[in-house]
């Protein structure tokens, strides 16, 4: 799930990066994407990728806008190879009018627990949360990650 920037290190060698987003201009401007697709996951959570097609899925600051998170993460699980990783990152920054109500009512720990619940309910294992930046020197950054069972 991406936009004009993928937040992937420039020196990280990846065979293929497939992007998802809502804005064709932004996705087209992202140099890390080999290919991309536009889809409103709140309307249609079925991802246009084959079963067990990818090794990892990154969701960067988008989880707070999902109205059908269990369906979306079940799809993420479907497209991941067994043992593949899902990595969900978020901050305390968002568009409050677009974020789901529950997200806005929770603190960072509550949001991490919520994302972990989404992943567990969608068939992921080895779920863990990490505080990568505490927010003292800028925006906080939280990651919740899990592995596809199977």
PLM features: residue spans?
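Class I SAM-dependent methyltransferase SAM/SAH-binding core
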Residues: 1-48
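Feature marks short, surface-exposed loop/turn motifs that line or immediately flank catalytic pockets
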Residues: 26, 45, 65, 94-97
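A short SAM/SAH-binding and catalytic strip from SAM-dependent methyltransferases
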Residues: 55-70
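A short glycine-rich, Lys/Arg-flanked "PGG" loop and its adjoining helix->strand segment in the class I
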Residues: 70-85
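Conserved class I S-adenosyl-L-methionine
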Residues: 85-116
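Core SAM-dependent methyltransferase catalytic element
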Residues: 122-125, 131-150
């Amino acid at each position: 799930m991406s936009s004009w920037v993928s937040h992937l290190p420039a020196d990280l060698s990846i065979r293929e990066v497939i992007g998802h987003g809502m804005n064709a201009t932004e996705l087209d401007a992202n140099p890390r994407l080999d290919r991309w697709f536009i889809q409103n996951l709140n309307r249609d959570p079925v991802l246009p990728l084959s079963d067990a097609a990818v090794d990892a899925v990154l969701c960067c600051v988008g989880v707070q806008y999902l109205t059908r998170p269990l369906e979306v993460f079940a799809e993420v699980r479907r497209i991941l190879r067994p043992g593949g990783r899902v990595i969900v990152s978020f901050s305390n920054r968002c568009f409050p009018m677009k974020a789901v109500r529950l997200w806005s009512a929770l603190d960072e720990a509550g949001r991490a627990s919520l994302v972990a619940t989404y992943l567990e309910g969608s068939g992921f294992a080895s779920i863990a949360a990490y505080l990568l930046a505490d927010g003292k020197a800028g925006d906080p950054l939280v990651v919740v990650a899990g592995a596809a069972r199977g």
